Amino acid sequence: MYGEILSFFYITFFILVLPTQIFGIFVILRFSTKHLKLWKKFLLCNLICQIISVATLCLLQLRQVSNLSPMEIWCYGPIRHFSAITSYLFYVLSQISTLMTYFLVFITIYLKYEAVKNVNKQNYRKVVIILMLLLPIFITMVAQIDLMIVFFSPNEAQKKFNELNAIITDHSVIGYVISGRISSFLLTVIIFGSVFLLPPAGFFIRKKIIRCINSTSDSASVGQKFQRRSFINGLTLQSFLPLVCICPIFACYFVVSRTKTDLPFEQHILPVLVMLPTLFDPYIILYSVTPYRKQIRTWLGMTKTVPMVIVASVMI
């Protein structure tokens, strides 16, 4: 029952999300001002990663069966007709692209703090900071390569997947969630850390940014300060969306995976909640960045045109 309902949901969700993501990319490319030159790149990468994440999750339609030992990863989407290793590659792509969206938002918040605090910071230091914050993504890639070697390297293992999936009609087994390996432990730490630690860290940095903005001299106008606050508030909201959407189901996942409880609702709904923030992110970006918001207000006819008033001055 869950599979039939969610197969329709995934298609509908993708149709809803894709146009907003493409529209967001268009607005960023077309209407970014000079002062958004750096942030434009991160906003674009974020939306592109979200498109990849949603597309792969909709093609996979995953279910992690927690009551089996080891925990099996089932695929109900169109990708199930491919080989197990191909499907697992899509699974890895969905995982990495999702993590990228979380870390890109946090990196943007941190670089905004650096920009507010030290205007003349050297470019090489920014590069070092970005690479350090992206290190968990590289670790995830290495860990997944290690797991793929374990799952698919022996020919007997691939034959086992082929034989197992040959007798299944509605889904395919594409891999396992195993414990006892360093790579599995690192993946768990990175995934849970990105969901539970990045949002509070982003909120803490936001407070420091607002403090820096408020303490700046009068050289920055009220409008400029408002634009900065609006931008950072939008980024903070983006970083908190995964926590709000995923926190309860992740807690449930942790319990059922340890107790080996069969809970179909949790198994099916987890991937849905993972991609749910992508529905709201484009709207947050377009509203929180002032040039984009002004352009959309212009398109909607909400910007009032002030008539020119000619005043005659009299010299005394």
Swiss-Prot record:
InterPro entries reported for this sequence: 7TM_GPCR_serpentine_rcpt_Srd, Nematode_rcpt-like_delta
Residue spans crossing the bilayer: 8-28, 42-62, 89-109, 127-147, 185-205, 236-256, 269-289
This protein's record includes keyword Transmembrane: yes
GO CC, one annotated term: membrane
Coiled-coil residue windows: none
Predominant cellular place of this UniProt entry's protein: membrane
This protein's UniProt keywords: Membrane, Transmembrane, Transmembrane helix
Cellular localisation: Membrane
Membrane topology label: Multi-pass membrane protein
Family membership noted in the UniProt record: Belongs to the nematode receptor-like protein srd family.
PANTHER family: SERPENTINE RECEPTOR CLASS DELTA-45-RELATED (PTHR22945:SF26), SERPENTINE RECEPTOR, CLASS D DELTA (PTHR22945)
Protein name (record): Serpentine receptor class delta-48
